[in-house]
């Protein structure tokens, strides 16, 4: 296994031996193997451990083990404690997303402080397979199907070339102990569900399913390199200026519909709106299309793109009965009858509203001076301008923020916070779930 990892590091030029390598060490099998292998290969390592305090005594047990293991290899050890639950609540993030943000921010802080060349994390081949399947289920393009990258900035993943089975066999051979995270044995999370339920079913069809998916991801990663190259060539010819695309140049490329989407998504246009724009290319000029930040005008020979900041404010009328509204941003709507054990996900991109407190139709608009709402969990009014200031919104972020409204009342600062007047309470009978898709 060590030889395989050495070749992988060399192939992708992940590490050199002249500067320290920071290593994320949770205490689990994968990170223990990662540190052990890198030390064996001669890299100067520094171990980093995050205690998220999410699993009671298990979290403290893992920290103690990680410290002892690093000391046994004579590797410097640094650790940090996080109040993950409070961080997630303050930012309306899932626990998983909060832990991810905290971990990688600290890793980068420590890399800069200690002069590290990179931070190595312990994603392996099976993690990559699970990621590909998750992206496929959620809907993705070639980038999502190519899986986890060996390098992402200063984060490197030397174990992507080996499987979980390889890692466990190597640990047993070396006599290394490791900690087991009890949550990894639960299928409560999507990734664990795929690991424990979906992959075993796929292996009944093809016992080599993991290897096959991993190889496919590697091939797609190579194909993505070609894809990016062609896209850059198209950009040079199609993008005449910051606000103008040439229809004629676009149509000379293969797969022009895909190229158009790749160019337009930088301006906030969804795939569905991009498809509508492409369909309009052969029709009469003059039609307008909107993203959350820009307006596009289809002219005879060009697509003209202008920022909504420079244009008159516009209000969009929404119809929750359609299920999904695509313009100017993509929102999905679901009406449910509430039950005693009704689950509420803590996610800034999802709003749970009392259906019977709303006046329809709902509307979507950008903010204006004098706007106010009652933030969820509060009793008093707050000017939206003050909310923006408190949360350090830039001018562009303010202009790009959309407000879901019921009559004159702001129901939801989309992607941020709902209004307390429309919250679910003990009298709620029906719930409207609004999901910000992009």
Curated annotation (Swiss-Prot):
Pfam families: ATP_bind_3, TilS_C. Coiled coil: none annotated. CDD domains: TilS_N. Belongs to the tRNA(Ile)-lysidine synthase family. It is found in: Cytoplasm. It comes from Parabacteroides distasonis (strain ATCC 8503 / DSM 20701 / CIP 104284 / JCM 5825 / NCTC 11152). GO terms for molecular function: ATP binding; tRNA(Ile)-lysidine synthase activity. InterPro entries: Lysidine-tRNA-synth_C, Rossmann-like_a/b/a_fold, TilS/TtcA_N, tRNA_Ile_lys_synt, tRNA_Ile_lys_synt_N. PANTHER family: TRNA(ILE)-LYSIDINE SYNTHASE-RELATED (PTHR43033:SF1). HAMAP family: tRNA_Ile_lys_synt. Keywords: ATP-binding, Cytoplasm, Ligase, Nucleotide-binding, tRNA processing. Its EC number is 6.3.4.19. Disulfide bonds: none annotated. The gene is tilS. The N-terminal region contains the highly conserved SGGXDS motif, predicted to be a P-loop motif involved in ATP binding. It catalyses: cytidine(34) in tRNA(Ile2) + L-lysine + ATP = lysidine(34) in tRNA(Ile2) + AMP + diphosphate + H(+). This is tRNA(Ile)-lysidine synthase. SUPFAM superfamilies: Adenine nucleotide alpha hydrolases-like, PheT/TilS domain. Its main location: cytoplasm.
């Amino acid at each position: 296994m060590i030889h395989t990892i050495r070749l992988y590091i060399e192939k992708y030029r992940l590490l050199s031996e002249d500067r320290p390598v920071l290593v994320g060490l949770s205490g689990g099998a994968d990170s223990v193997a990662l540190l052990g292998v890198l030390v064996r290969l001669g890299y100067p390592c520094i171990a980093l451990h995050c205690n998220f305090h999410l699993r009671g005594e298990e979290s403290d047990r893992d920290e103690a083990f990680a410290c002892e293991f690093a000391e046994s290899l004579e590797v410097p050890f640094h650790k940090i404690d996080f109040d993950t639950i409070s961080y997630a609540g303050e930012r309306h993030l899932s626990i998983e997303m909060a832990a991810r943000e905290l971990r990688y921010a600290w890793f980068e802080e420590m890399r800069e402080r200690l002069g590290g060349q990179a931070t190595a994390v312990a994603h392996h081949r099976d993690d990559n397979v699970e990621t590909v399947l998750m992206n496929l289920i959620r809907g993705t393009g070639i980038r999502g199907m190519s899986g986890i990258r060996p390098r992402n900035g200063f984060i490197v993943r030397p174990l992507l070339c080996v499987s979980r089975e390889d890692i466990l066999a190597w640990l047993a051979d070396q006599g290394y102990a490791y900690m087991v995270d009890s949550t990894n044995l639960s299928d409560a999370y999507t990734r664990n569900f795929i690991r424990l339920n979906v992959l075993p079913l796929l292996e009944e069809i093809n016992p080599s399913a993991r290897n096959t998916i991993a190889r496919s991801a590697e091939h797609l990663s190579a194909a993505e390199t070609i894809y990016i190259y062609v896209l850059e060539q198209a950009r040079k010819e199609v993008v005449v200026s910051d606000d103008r695309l040439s229809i004629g140049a676009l149509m000379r490329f293969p797969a022009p519909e895909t190229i158009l989407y790749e160019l337009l998504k930088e301006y906030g246009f969804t795939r569905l709106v991009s498809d509508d724009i492409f369909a309009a290319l052969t029709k009469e000029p003059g039609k307008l299309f909107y993203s959350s930040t820009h307006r596009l005008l289809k002219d005879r020979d060009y697509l003209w793109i202008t920022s909504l900041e420079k244009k008159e404010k516009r209000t969009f009328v929404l119809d929750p009965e359609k299920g999904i509204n695509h313009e100017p941003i993509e929102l999905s709507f679901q009406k449910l009858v509430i039950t005693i054990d009704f689950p509420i996900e803590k996610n800034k991109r999802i709003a749970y509203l009392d259906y019977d407190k709303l006046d329809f139709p709902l509307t979507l608009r950008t903010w204006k001076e004098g706007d106010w709402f009652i933030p969820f969990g509060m009793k008093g009014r707050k000017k939206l301008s003050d909310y923006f200031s408190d949360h350090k919104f830039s001018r562009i972020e303010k202009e790009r923020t959309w407000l879901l409204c019921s009559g004159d009342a702001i129901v939801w600062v989309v992607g941020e916070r709902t209004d307390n007047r429309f919250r679910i309470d003990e009298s709620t009978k029906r719930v409207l779930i609004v999901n910000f898709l992009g």
